[in-house]
């Protein structure tokens, strides 16, 4: 039998290449999606990106604050996860949770797995930036709102074996409170006893909502781990995290190349996959 093969034309080759490229992209997407699902199953409230999504819910944040502050009269009116505060004159910050209650009090809640990330001067810095960003030009100092910076830490940062530490300025000579309404709190997640706070810290370590003590938190965790819409939301969050990490790596590469001083802005932009304007801005910032 004589079998004749039609010679492959240019268009046929291009179509074949496109199909192959599409298949590779689909396989890569499926691999990343499966990795995301596996990672999502292991998330706990002690993971800041997951915690930020869970506590974007006002009722969950109210519940959290009521236990930490031992108050039942607190009502949250706004809450934002992964909230950026810009500082044009210095270092900007991204807050895990920023909430405001009905009385105008401001709450910054941070999850810190590493001791370095929970150092005391970071708490001070967060507090100062919050003060600077909630005031308007010309506003009277007495109108400055009461603020709380709360660190929930994986380790006992204060090394005293206590479940919670309250830090407020005092007058050294009299021992009386200074009364500036600026509060810093460290919560030691290592203590998971039968107190309300201990049960809350137990829930922060759970990967399975069935193991959690508090229904309000378990339902929110279950939504992001098991509900189709919740899972899709978390997958988008993880994709954004990958993109942000990749961009940070490109910026770091550009900064290293600028430091070497051997390439033009255009060459650095092409190598680091940034715009020429972005490279120039990085250089000007480095000089400043």
Can you annotate each of these PLM segments?
Residues 1-183, 193-195:
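Accessory alpha/beta interaction modules
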Residues 2-41, 45, 49, 68, ...:
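Short, charged alpha-helical interaction segments and adjacent helix-coil junctions
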Residues 151-154, 188-189, 225:
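Pocket-edge structural micro-motifs
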Residues 171-180, 188-190, 200, 204-207:
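Low-complexity, glycine/alanine/valine/leucine- and proline-rich hydrophobic stretches
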